[in-house]
Amino acid sequence: MGAPSLPRAWQLYLKEHRVSTFKNWPFVNGCSCTPERMAEAGFIHCPTENEPDLAQCFFCFKELEGWEPDDNPIEEHKKHSSGCAFLSVKKQFEELTLSEFLKLDKERAKNKIAKETNSKQKEFEETAAKVRQAMEQLAALE
């Protein structure tokens, strides 16, 4: 029987797992935003067809794209998401006590819920606007 594996969300606390997401990352050599430095700053690579350099913090879920070779990932992260608790962690994942880890992961879970809630709210508002417009068009026919 092999060693138990961590849930995917917890695997992302390990830098090497974050680095492994940077397949086809455009900035590899002679750049400030290499996969290693991006991972150190908490980012994972989640490219889309229109945003091949899209990176997201696994902890605060802030998405950034439009990276330039000289961008400093930690500074960009601080600039766009200064309240991210991951930026203030001074220990490696393996060095955290269970209590420290659970407290940290509770913050990550709160961030995830907030991002998902905001996304659903935006989706609801867009649908409501379309329905409202359709109702107004029907009312105009009367």
Swiss-Prot record:
Tissues where this protein is expressed: Expressed in spleen, lung, brain, heart, kidney and intestine (at protein level). Expressed in cochlea including the organ of Corti, the lateral wall, the interdental cells of the Limbus as well as in cells of the cochlear nerve and the spiral ganglions (at protein level). Also expressed in Schwann cells (at protein level). Not expressed in cells of the inner and outer sulcus or the Reissner's membrane (at protein level).
BIR repeats: 18-88
UniProt xrefs under InterPro entries: Baculoviral_IAP, BIR_rpt
Entry's Gene Ontology cellular component terms: chromosome, centromeric region; cytoplasm; kinetochore; microtubule; midbody; nucleus; spindle midzone
SUPFAM superfamilies linked: Inhibitor of apoptosis (IAP) repeat (SSF57924)
Signal peptide: none
Entry PTM: Ubiquitinated by the Cul9-RING ubiquitin-protein ligase complex, leading to its degradation. Ubiquitination is required for centrosomal targeting. Deubiquitinated by USP35 or USP38; leading to stabilization.
Positions where Phosphothreonine occurs in the chain: 34, 48, 117
Entry-linked PROSITE patterns: BIR_REPEAT_2
Signals that turn on the gene: Expression is up-regulated in the spiral ligament and nerve fibers of the cochlea upon moderate noise exposure causing only a temporary hearing impairment. Expression is down-regulated in the organ of Corti, the spiral ganglion, the stria vascularis and the spiral ligament of the cochlea upon intratympanic injection of aminoglycoside antibiotic gentamicin inducing cell damage and permanent hearing loss.
Oligomer status and interactors: Monomer or homodimer. Exists as a homodimer in the apo state and as a monomer in the CPC-bound state. The monomer protects cells against apoptosis more efficiently than the dimer. Only the dimeric form is capable of enhancing tubulin stability in cells. When phosphorylated, interacts with LAMTOR5/HBXIP; the resulting complex binds pro-CASP9, as well as active CASP9, but much less efficiently.
PANTHER family assigned to the protein according to its UniProt record, in alphabetical order: BACULOVIRAL IAP REPEAT-CONTAINING PROTEIN 5, DETERIN
Purpose: Multitasking protein that has dual roles in promoting cell proliferation and preventing apoptosis. Component of a chromosome passage protein complex (CPC) which is essential for chromosome alignment and segregation during mitosis and cytokinesis. Acts as an important regulator of the localization of this complex; directs CPC movement to different locations from the inner centromere during prometaphase to midbody during cytokinesis and participates in the organization of the center spindle by associating with polymerized microtubules.
Protein name: Baculoviral IAP repeat-containing protein 5
Record organism: Cavia porcellus
Name of encoding gene: BIRC5
